[in-house]
Structures are given as structure tokens and as C-alpha cells.
Amino acid sequence: MPNPDHNRDKLLATCILGGVAAVGLTIYLARCHRRGSPSGRPVRVYMDGCFDMMHYGHCNALRQARALGDQLVVGVVSDAEIIANKGPPVTPLNERMIMVRAVKWVDEVIPDAPYAITEEFMRKLFDEYKIDFIIHGDDPCVLPDGTDAYALAKKAGRYKQIKRTEGVSSTDIVGRMLLCVRERSVSDVQNHSTLQRQFSTGRSPKFDDVVSDSRTKISQFLPTSRRIVQFSNEKSPGPDARVVYIDGAFDLFHAGHVETLRIARGLGDFLLVGIHTDQSVSAKRGVHRPIMSLHERSLSVLACRYVDEVIIGAPWEVSRDMITTFNISLVVHGTTAENTDFQKEQNNPYAVPISMGIFKVLESPLDITTTTLIRRIVANHEAYQKRNEKKAASEKKYYEGKTRTSYNCPYRTSMYSETHSFIV
């Protein structure tokens, strides 16, 4: 008897051959390879990481890992392990757990995972969590003693490798913020407020040098329609669906954003998120903002399980025409946000939904904003500067040694090869 899942997957690949065939075909082939667990149960794959300053590159890695199995279990490294191996994390474990749990490709999360997979922890993964394969990117993960953090998994023949997402890393994001503070001392309390003001206004003694440095990145993010399709949901609101709309910059997408989106999603059937343009954010919050570009911010929001659709480059003001076009039932805004004084603005961006009686202010569960993260960097920027210098060297080595990645199907090589990198 034919497998109905097989026919469904094949139909998915066939239906979109005239448009974005690579996405559907990749999903189909990945599913073909991940089937066939000896016990007949779902294939469970494991990926771990620090997930500090979580970004769309992390999310894309989790998406690729999930495509190699039926269930994705994610280990989040403890604060103590990160400090011992890399330096202080910007976001503590509780915030990193919120971020990882919110990624729509994640099925289960293990807190306080070790930085290196020990024999004991590997056995726990295989026996207790029923993990079939351990996944990691093709960028090296080297311990302080120079050994491979995944050596045991490779030796056991249970290791699979995916391609890292180029153009972004936590090191790069922290580096973007450090550009404004690299020549300042944080020993003087007075300097803290000065640095924060400079971050908002863009004024610094050597601003021209800072701008020049920001153009010399090792790798640059190049958005493609294929990546957006991979992150998008294949759903639209029904005719009677209650559509909830929330907008913002969503810069340095963090736990505060996630928790607000979770509450917003609970108020309706479909959550539509508007992502403001780079120009709008800069005009309202200073020339150094946003830290992440419009497409980078959009991908981070799209990866969130509470989000159904995004408007890439949403208008600052919510108009009546926009409400009608998207059939919006409710417009919401959090109490903890960068622009909480919007009602004092000459042109209140929410004037129309307020007049229509469809506007609601949400009590934000967490007192975290993008500025909160920037202040953490500013307060301890010397430690992050040292960490970045060390990490940047390894990233440079990775990019110098990388080989061309083809868009052709990567599944001709056996899935059970330890060295093959899967691109999905």
C-alpha cells in the first residue's frame, strides 16, 4: 500500500516546480533520507549551542537540523559553561531558553547542556532522549585545549553536519555595537550614560573611522527570496479569522519581543507583525539604529512560532486602508517598548485604530528592550571586545577556507557520511 506521506511530499515538490522548486524538492529529499529508523519510530536529532544574542543564523541552523529528522531536541549551554569556554554571555540562560523554545522548528529543549559533549552526556542523549543523530554546523567548535567538541559523536558514527549561515554571527552583532564604544573606558560611571547617548545620536570623536570599519566585515548578509520562503508559514487567515496586528523595529530580536508576541497571538487566530524600515527606525531612534537590517530583523521574527505573517517594511502609521486590506481586528502595542510615548507624538501612529476602538496596550511580561542589550554590552564592553577579537580570528579562518556551495541537490552523498554537509 502506498505511503500517503510519500505522496504528499512528492506533491509538495511537484506543485511548486514552476516557482521555488528548490525549497519543495529539498524538503522532499530530506524527508526521504531521514526515514528508515531501525525501530520504525520518528528520527530524533539533537543540536546544541549557546544561542547568545540569538539571531536568524541560529534559527536557520535549527531549521536545517529539523529537516534531517522528525523531531528536533535542542540543548542550551549553561551560563557557567559559556563563561568558562568563551567569556560572559550577553543574555542569561532564562532568556536564551525563551528564545530557543520560541523557534518554530524546535520540538524539545534541554537546559544547562554542556559546552562539550562528554561520554556520559552522549549516552544520556542516546538512551534517555532517544537521539539518533547529533547535528552541528561546518564551522569548527574547538575547546580551550584544542580538541573537537564533537569528537565523541563523530567517533560513534552519529554525527551529521549542516552548512552555517553566512553573513551573521553573535560575534558580528556584538561587534556592530562595540564600534561605538571601542575607545572608551567603562571604569568611569559618567562614561556609561555618555556612551549610551552616543549610541543613540551617532556622535563620537572618530565616527568616520567607525563607519569605515563597519564596511570591512568578513561576510555580508545577502537576502534572497529562497531564504524568506524557507522561513515563511504556508498559511493565510480564514475569512472569519481574528487578525491581530503588532508593529515595531524588533531590532536584536530578544526574549522581551518573544513574550509580547506570545501574548498578542493569544488574542486572536492570526498574528500579523509589521517590521519597520531601517529609515524609520533611524529617524526615531538615532543613526546607529537599527543594529540589524530590515531583512535580518524580518527573518528573526518569521522564525518565531507565534508569528503567522510579517509585513517587511511596514508603514510607521497604521492607516484605515491597511486595516481594511489585511482585515485587522485588533492592533496591539506593548508597555515595554522603545516608543512608549507614541501618544505624545504630533502624528500618533495608532490614531486610526484608537478612533475605531480596536487598539489595545499589552502589559509586557519582561522589562527588556533593545536598549537593555546595548547597555549590557556597554557596561562590560572590554570583556566582549576581547572575546570578539578571539572569535573573529576563527571566523576569518572559516571564510578563507570555505569552498563554493552549490544550489544543486546535496543528497547524492549518503546521509551516513560523517563529513558531508547538508544544505536544506
Regions found by a protein language model. Give the residues of each.
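Nucleotidyltransferase catalytic core that binds NTPs
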Residues: 2-424
